[in-house]
Amino acid sequence: PGFLMGQIASFLGAGFLGGMIGGYLAGYIALFIRNHLKVPKWAEALMPMMIIPTLSALIAGLIMFFVIGNPIVWATNALTNFITGLDQSSKGVYGFIIGALGCIDFGGPISKVPNLICDGLLLEGITEPEAIKVLAAMVPPLGITFSLVLSKVLKKPIYAAQEVENIKVAFPMGLCMISEGVIPIAMNDLIRTCICTATGCGVTGAISFTLGVGSKVPSGGVFVIPAMSNPLAALIALLAGTAVTGVLLVLIKKRRTGDE
């Protein structure tokens, strides 16, 4: 059923929104059928392989074609036209929002929403949000690593010994666009860390969008920067966000010593 919803969305021109909504619709209909449809004993074995998929695909397909298809097409076109019609100042604002939300919980459920939208826009041929997603995902681990280096230079220790070891692991993960490595570090000072990393990611997103950086590759970290439409601007955006994150962390985190 989910595959069929994707094909219907493509046929209608509903884009990624149509595929996403259609997939959820088919899934919930299948769940409803499984929980509420009673069949004879001899047909129970057919439920998971034939009855549920057939009925859910039929019902969801009819709803997509005749009820929600056209509104989704309109919403997809409106979103595409809105993104492509942004001026430079607006790009900075929306780039900041996309970047900040895309890493606010280090790859958790909140960041999945804007990242999914970026992936969908990539399917529509809009590559700038995808570049923000790739670059911003690297900022938390790189920014925290930079804050460790900066704190040593300024002789203001802000991380305990175990956190330092975790940062050594998080840094190479961050280069590969895996921001989850900073979660053990962030959990020790969650609010301050989230504020600093979200700000840094927002700066990266704003610079990237304003300078027109685009990425046709949805993942890969630093290894896909050469494939972006403006690699130098992408590198500038990444370094700027990293620097902002690191400086803010050194400024607002409390001094720590040893394994405190």
Regions found by a protein language model. Name each.
Residues P1-K41, M49-D259:
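Pore-lining transmembrane helices
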